[in-house]
Amino acid sequence: MNRIQFIGASLFALAIANPSFAQTAPQAAPQPAEEDNSADIIVTASKRAQTLQDTPISVAVASAAQIEQSQIRDLLDLQTLVPSLKVGQLQSSANTNFIIRGFGNGANNAGIEPSVGVFIDGVYRSRSAAQIGDLPNIERVEVLRGPQSTLFGKNASAGIISIVTAEPKFEFGGQLEASYGNYNAIVVKGNVTGPLSETLAVSLAGSYNKRDGYARYVNLNQENNNRNRYGIRGQILWQPSSDFKLRIIGDYDKIDEVCCTVANIFDGPTGGAVRALGGQINSNQPYSFNSFANIPSVNKIDNYGVSAQVDARVTDTLSLVSITAYRGVKIFTNQDSDFTSADLIGDNRSNTKIDTFTQELRLLSDFDGPFNFLLGGYYFNEKIRNSGQLTFGQSFRNYANFLSGGGYGGSEAALRSVNPGLPAGQFGGVGQGRFENYNYRDEAFSVFGNVDFKITDGLTLSGGFNYTIDRKAVVTNNRSTDVFSSIDLDASVATLRAGGIAQTIGGLLGVPGGFASAAQVAAFATANPAGFTAISNGVNAQVNPLLGLKPLQFIPPFLNFPNAVENGKTKDSNFSYTVRLAYKFNRNISSYVTYATGFKASSFNLSIDSRPFPRDFIPGSPVTNPAPSAIRTAGLALNNLTSGTRFAGPENAAVYEVGLKGNWQGFSFNLAVFKQILKGFQSNVFVGTGFVLGNAEKQSTQGFELDASLTPIRNLNFTASITYLDPKFDSFAGGTAFNPLTNNTGPANLTGVRPSGVSEWSIAVGATHTTELSDSLKMIAHIDYDHASSFVIAQGLPFKASPETLNASLTFALRNGLEVTAWGRNLTEPLFNPVIFPGVAQSGTLSGYPSPPKTY
């Protein structure tokens, strides 16, 4: 037993099906290696069932067998099979980012919709929290690369991930999988299906995934980065005739985990202050799984929904598809965001509730002639309610005092003298901070269509369109209780300076009461300019250091909206289209040429970092005489209010693509060469105290993708995928980057710079061999490896990463359906930091997420 545990073991697919079920439901059993892997693969990338060979789109397909053999549990693991897809998990389980061809966003803010759309059984999952659960009883996963807005709508400017699950069967069967691995990992998955009548079939699937954390909070003696999730999924299929089918799906899954560990990459100058307060930091250990905190990082997600799909043949040549769905997501997170044992940040918690309703209708033709069409409509309605808070902990006041040489607390008396409403002893008080409440609504309508016209037997001209109207509205009710951040230091210093000068001159003149009048000060300055300069310099030396405390004003007052100037609404309309010419040379080789556009609607910044646009407000204290602006004119200006963005404008994508596909007995390939352009890419960058949301004027990439499969002999199959990307910011004057000398972020002109996080080369290769040990037993050996060339992790910093993953499995399969598998993932255990960010409220400190360990 010890030997088996060393290499990893799982009991796989303990089937309760008879052999005939396994034949009718290949998605529920491993694909035998001796099968012809070049056989036609059916996909629905064009919203029609077509072979992969006949689909003129760059599509990567992961079958159920590949997912099983590589031990892929969720979309985070899927990137090891599709090199042009990159998935990154950030500070919580709910913050996962999907990137295709170097384009992608949508994490860290509920108001930002992703550029990569995720669909499960045709239903859009609008946020990553609704996408990251363990994959259900799947049939295949399709990754559509490049803009797909013509058929998939407003949030497909970079691509689509489409997960297709198995329908209920009219023959009784099922599957049970139980797995045990390192870190006490226990995974149980099962499904059962069968008929209730000749026209009604049902299925029920469930999963349970629990694992100890591979990281630890040293001072708390608690685990981090654990797994604790489960889900259940039920389906009803009613098919009274071959012309009508109704499929109803209901599902619920839950995540209750501690995630995600953060490593100290560089301990900046503030580290000394943390340690002086008795705090602990695992300094300069970029790949360590040991960290310090005051509370574990809580991640709780409830994801649920129901959908109904109707497929009806209206006439002999027309079919109607209707998909109606409701999705709900509840998210709760809480984190000690300073990532030290010093109690600097008390709470950083967030409660989010998302309700989404979608309705899609499609009318499809099936004419015998050269002309066929698809015409559809789509409705989207989403409501988000978000509340959260970030508060100071027990040590924050002392931390600020240490950094300011005592000036933070020592300034209270002076500042209270010119701000009489300030409470005493409240600078940096425990529990002060920001308190947020957002109500967000998004409503969108679209009509779309596609026409195929066969010019000749092999040549087809296609054209498609999508017209979308998207309306968003946000209402905020936010407040800051940070007393120190509410003070106008410029005005306070000006008042203290004037008072100090008046008092000094009054003393020299013997003025009763001790303070000279303005007229007396002016007369003194005229009569004795040298003396006045000396007095001014002396007073300035006393009061000007207060201006150096501005960086400690972390949480200034928030201007809520809608208000008299800002209506809190956006309205976007877009016409996306596709023009494609496809040519089939013969039954084995086909090609296509495509020009397509894509669209992503505006995204609101649902965080305390939401600020008025510069067109509405020019910041500055009244004593500095800032230029007039609408918000100031309306009397809405607040102390320390700054400008920024309320929302990022829409993304508009375009792609030029040429593809070539081949399929022979034992060998197939798909090649796509492209140039892709994205105008208005929505950039959301963390800068240590918050996120900067904006638009890059233009970002582009060019490259190619090659997917191939080779079966040289009956029992041996090889797969390979290669992606080459050459991206750059063509225009991004308002970017954000690190200063490598200080490790702090700031504005940067990134025009002409290669975006961080994008490899030039990415490859994924795999091999599967089947050995017939007897008539009733076979052995399936599988190995796959993916590698990405080095890339810059964070804009402006020298750190680079070159990720790789090696996975392997060995399966013994009995003819009666019982299988036993030993498996391992990430066996080479490479060390790198996929993400680096500035330390929270710790200038000069760098933090990051360490790469995960091997599992088996």
Where are these regions (language model features)?
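Periplasmic N-terminal accessory/gating domains of Gram-negative outer-membrane beta-barrel systems
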Residues: 29, 57-106, 116-134, 140-148
